[in-house]
Amino acid sequence: MTQFEPVIGLEIHLQLNTNSKLFCSCPSGMADNPIPNSAVCPVCTAQPGTLPVLNKGAVELAVKAALALNLEINKISLFDRKNYFYPDLPKGYQITQLFKPISEHGWLEVNGRKVGITRAHMEEDAGKSIHHASYSLIDWNRAGTPLLEIVSEPEIHSADEAYEFLTKLKSNVSWVGASNADMEKGELRVDVNISLRPAGIKTFGTKVEIKNLNSFKAVRDAINVEIERQTEMLNEGKKIKQETLLFDKEKGETVSMRSKEDALDYRYFPDPDLPPLVLADEWLESVIASRPEMPARRKERFTKDYGLSDYDAGVLTSERALSEYYEDTVKTGANPKNAANWITTDLLGAINAAKLDINDCPVTAKQLGTIVTLTDSGKISRAQAKKVFEQCWQTKKDPEVIVKELGLEQVSDENQLETWAKEAIAENPKIVSDVKSGNPKAIGALIGSVMKKSKGKANPGKMNEIFAKLLQ
């Protein structure tokens, strides 16, 4: 049986995070507005005599996204018309960038190697068709929303690599604020182009396109299903037909939608209503200079400067706001490793349970830093610290105030601790005998006795040291 290599390319449509549409002042991001056709105007509904005016903010976000994907910025780019008729496309054409896009020749690191990005170009979104049994309705709220279409090179060779590519792309573009990239809201849409070729052969096989992918998991599942389908067909001597497929996640299969259109069908030509987009050197330099430290670099710094594990650094740099929260916590003087442990377990656990975003977290970085420091200094135990965290979450009070109000501060005075230790030794001769007979774990019972005497306020770490000294 012949071994085949998958050859995969991705086309990603990214909704840019602007307040208004690409060529008019109508509000953007209104696709889910319950009132259809309420965010439209003569421009985005293509009324006669209207002209497009390019949104400068969309250009800036497109450049920021492109830089985050290591793309080269073209200082001069052009807009073109992609001609096709569809009811939710009011003009009868889509304004896009075919001949001279705003950016080209980028890459993302996947599985230890660079996967190329052919281009990223600006274009406007179409509207939305709502189909009923005997009629269809059109909602143009989404028409004209600014998109950045990102096209990868056919250099992805597995479903897992495609998943990693998309995960890094989403992380990078959301990191720079270009897009929220939320697939559930339609802010990031993915089409997959895939073909198979015999291992070791460089020529491409017949490709198919897969649509209707609403999550990264769906992308991974669809690729695996299609690889299996094509492998079976090729081994049976059948030919792959060039077509567009839909992925049915319920049945776990790809279904034919239509034969694949040739790009020439769209009759592209330059848009006569839009002049060339020229990016001034000074403006472009200011955008480049405003770039934040990117996730990969920040992750590397966290492992090097703070001694974090690769896993913890990865979690903390999964979102820009989360990484900044962590650094703000460390700036309070909190131990970096212990702060990371608190954030990756207690804090994120509470945030996820409450279905909140890190920006909405009721416990500030300063407050968490105080909790970490109180614990590390021995003033409160880890168990008590959790109580303080919960109270801080609910009341937003200062942790030190909560410690005083609840009477949680541990006793660390050695004279008092030694007095309790001697009392526990006198009251528990059997346990003392066990310790002296070579069972050091029995000290735990003595510490438990002291914790009862102190109503849980004795510092257990110091008690362990004192018992070890007294029972030598």
Swiss-Prot record:
Keywords: ATP-binding, Ligase, Nucleotide-binding, Protein biosynthesis
EC number: 6.3.5.-
Any single GO BP term: translation
Catalytic activity from the UniProt record: L-glutamyl-tRNA(Gln) + L-glutamine + ATP + H2O = L-glutaminyl-tRNA(Gln) + L-glutamate + ADP + phosphate + H(+); L-aspartyl-tRNA(Asn) + L-glutamine + ATP + H2O = L-asparaginyl-tRNA(Asn) + L-glutamate + ADP + phosphate + 2 H(+)
Superkingdom: Bacteria
InterPro entries membership: Asn/Gln-tRNA_amidoTrfase_suB/E, Asn/Gln-tRNA_Trfase_suB/E_cat, Asn/Gln_amidotransferase, Asn/Gln_tRNA_amidoTrase-B-like, GatB, GatB_C_1, GatB_Yqey_C_2, Gln_synth/guanido_kin_cat_dom
GO molecular function: asparaginyl-tRNA synthase (glutamine-hydrolyzing) activity; ATP binding; glutaminyl-tRNA synthase (glutamine-hydrolyzing) activity
Protein role: Allows the formation of correctly charged Asn-tRNA(Asn) or Gln-tRNA(Gln) through the transamidation of misacylated Asp-tRNA(Asn) or Glu-tRNA(Gln) in organisms which lack either or both of asparaginyl-tRNA or glutaminyl-tRNA synthetases. The reaction takes place in the presence of glutamine and ATP through an activated phospho-Asp-tRNA(Asn) or phospho-Glu-tRNA(Gln).
NCBIfam families, per database record: gatB, PRK05477.1-2, PRK05477.1-4
Protein family per UniProt: Belongs to the GatB/GatE family. GatB subfamily.
Assembly and oligomerization: Heterotrimer of A, B and C subunits.
Name of the protein in its database record: Aspartyl/glutamyl-tRNA(Asn/Gln) amidotransferase subunit B
Organism: Elusimicrobium minutum (strain Pei191)
Taxonomy of the source species: Bacteria, Pseudomonadati, Elusimicrobiota, Elusimicrobia, Elusimicrobiales
